[in-house]
């Protein structure tokens, strides 16, 4: 099913043409000049949402650019689409589904009727079940088959059932307070599971199998191998004490041997990449507890309310999404670097890759017609200062335009003094954060370098051209609430871009064919006798070489 109403071509609108002309006018105007012409922009082009201070002044935009981008958003009916999403309309048109990840963090006393049900009651029933279970786990009331307390939960999932929990656990592991750690298995490569289980005791290990349908190939393959590891040590009867499921398929969960009382459900209106604040976050709740998890959800809700109510001119996710679109469609940027100056956010860029690229990596609009402009930013990145010694060279002096998001915190969870005694290691980290955004924006001219006595032959090599844009996001401290706020800002950026491009940001048909083809190829590479010839010579040769190196005939 596609959208019943044709979607106007945004690139054929006066608002798009006005932005094109505006780009021609401001051209390559340097950020040095933009700041000189508008010296207060460093204070004015900021927005505070919850605990997040967001500075977007170091972008190659003027106040006129912002006004024109807002006009574009209104031309695309962003606010109406936003209201439809929050109301539970079926805006995932290709699958005829509501899109209600925002309902996962509504307070208990809220009401949202969708398809005849108050989904808030359903959400909190699951949250209560999660809380009761994790309370028992954390207190030691729930034990393994031998009576020992559980000390490690292993989440088995893939995609949204893995990337979100991995990232959040890494970010909030300092809040783990009950002696329970979490590990994660996603890859069907056996090395992943083998390494994860190598030093674990089956008697103190609990597995969470996270699969909506309970039929995902990678997840069920790993879960079956994990069950074998457990039963080899403790016997078949131990499965019910050492496995729980996050799924909607009670029959398959029961067939696997998991007690159906230990199923934590979710709904088809929650996409995998938007599900870390659902039962998919059970491993996180087990580690940090239900109260900290509630704080995590409250952070999402703070930004949800801001996005739902603020006009585009002062709406942080909308503005950042529109700025991203400005670079993608008018300045030719193809990627965005995500640079958290926090070791705890080591997995944040990987998480955002799925959130953004699976959502907006589309070439077909929601009405089934082809898009008429580039869509989908390529997200990548690394924590600072590691990235500075890896790829910042390209950001500073390369030929490609790469807008960057810098994320930092004023107060670390832990800190150490520097050897010199001037501040702390965290101060040193954040001095790099501020310096990098400054140098990217303003650079250093040949004249400035020559004035320092640099040999003339070396001057061109040391020129820092600047005019490289960035967003700075600063919060006091990385808490569960702040992490929820940060994720929600990016969720709603994705939505904003998708609305303007006219695409369905909530399906992912592009991942299906490869999975189907893999199932078809598995018997080809494992069967006895000569394999079926493939339709292309490359795949055929690869399959035959693989079979030979595995000692199989044909």
UniProtKB/Swiss-Prot annotation:
Residues 527-540 have a biased composition (Polar residues). Coiled coil: none annotated. Residues 544-554 have a biased composition (Basic residues). It is found in: Cytoplasm. One of its GO terms (biological process) is gluconeogenesis. It comes from the Bacteria. It catalyses: alpha-D-glucose 6-phosphate = beta-D-fructose 6-phosphate. Its EC number is 5.3.1.9. The active site is at residues 358, 389, 515. One of its GO terms (molecular function) is monosaccharide binding. Belongs to the GPI family. HAMAP family: G6P_isomerase. Catalyzes the reversible isomerization of glucose-6-phosphate to fructose-6-phosphate. This is Glucose-6-phosphate isomerase. The lineage of its organism: Bacteria, Bacillati, Actinomycetota, Actinomycetes, Mycobacteriales.
